[in-house]
């Protein structure tokens, strides 16, 4: 386990009781370096959508716990926000919630010179995802071959 993964896991453990107390869902936690700064980001959601006030409540509690546990030696910026419209799908609960929705899939390696696919998520399990494309064809992808899945944005 990398340090980054260790920090993300510990952050998830600190966030879990805060999420349960407020009936929020922890969508994702990431510890990343961007433009020379480290960021610890928590993406939260709830039925009906998350508000700025919800993010503030979680941020204050989470910040206090992070200060108390002090497991990240680097300076970092804490951000708590909603996952946004084009949220990535990572966990089974994300896929379950998104059944019947249009998704974008990006693969690590191309299939017939194509890495990007789009379609309606029709099924999934631990090993694979299945989508129905606009032309009605069904495609199955091994989860191990998928770099990223997110909800498709239609404007």
From Swiss-Prot:
Gene3D superfamilies: Ribosome maturation factor RimP, C-terminal domain (2.30.30.180), RimP-like superfamily, N-terminal (3.30.300.70)
Keywords, ordered alphabetically: Cytoplasm, Ribosome biogenesis
One GO term (biological process): ribosomal small subunit assembly
Domain of life per record: Bacteria
Main location: cytoplasm
Keyword Cytoplasm attached: yes
InterPro entries: Ribosome_maturation_RimP, RimP_C, RimP_C_sf, RimP_N, RimP_N_sf
Annotated localization: Cytoplasm
A Pfam short name: RimP_N
A GO CC term assigned to this protein in UniProt: cytosol
Annotated signal sequence range: none
Known function: Required for maturation of 30S ribosomal subunits.
PANTHER family to which the protein is assigned, alphabetical: RIBOSOME MATURATION FACTOR RIMP (PTHR33867:SF1)
Family, per entry: Belongs to the RimP family.
HAMAP family xrefs: RimP
Protein name from the UniProt record: Ribosome maturation factor RimP
């Amino acid at each position: 386990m990398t340090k980054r993964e260790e920090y993300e896991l510990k952050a998830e453990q600190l966030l879990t009781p805060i999420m349960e107390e407020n009936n929020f869902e922890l969508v994702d936690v990431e510890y990343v370096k961007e433009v020379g700064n480290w960021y610890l980001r928590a993406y939260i959601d709830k039925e009906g959508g998350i508000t700025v006030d919800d993010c503030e409540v979680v941020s204050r509690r989470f910040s206090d716990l992070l200060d108390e546990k002090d497991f990240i030696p680097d300076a970092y910026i804490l951000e708590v926000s909603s996952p946004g419209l084009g949220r990535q799908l990572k966990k089974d609960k994300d896929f379950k919630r998104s059944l019947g929705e249009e998704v974008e899939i990006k693969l690590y390696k191309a299939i017939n010179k194509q890495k990007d696919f789009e379609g309606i998520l029709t099924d999934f399990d631990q090993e694979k995802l299945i989508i129905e494309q606009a032309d009605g064809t069904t495609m199955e992808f091994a989860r191990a071959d998928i770099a990223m899945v997110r909800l498709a944005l239609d404007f």
